[in-house]
């Protein structure tokens, strides 16, 4: 049976900034796990979500079904003016994204700290546009 295998996904919200999350799946995102993965991330795909870092350090394989979930998530966030950033990609995952020309290079980061720093920068630029002072990282 496809789409019915459970997948472990760790989701954490940034305690200093509401609406910013890190999602860290474990294993593979494929035809056996994509439905469970999608179900687990669905609660944070809300209009109040400002940014998501998808940490793929523990993902060894992503199938077309898994890519579909990621593209849907990216599209939803983009429509809401939010961002989806990727970090800790294993070489085969990075190559997959390059082959399908799926992600702009500015959304791929070496690690979560680098992605988080980028989100801080983008958040401060938005705050400055609205006439407020910049926030400092916690």
Give the label of every model feature segment:
Residues 11-12, 51, 120-121:
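Short leucine-rich amphipathic alpha-helices used at interfaces
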Residues 28-106:
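Amphipathic alpha-helical interaction surfaces in cytosolic regulatory modules
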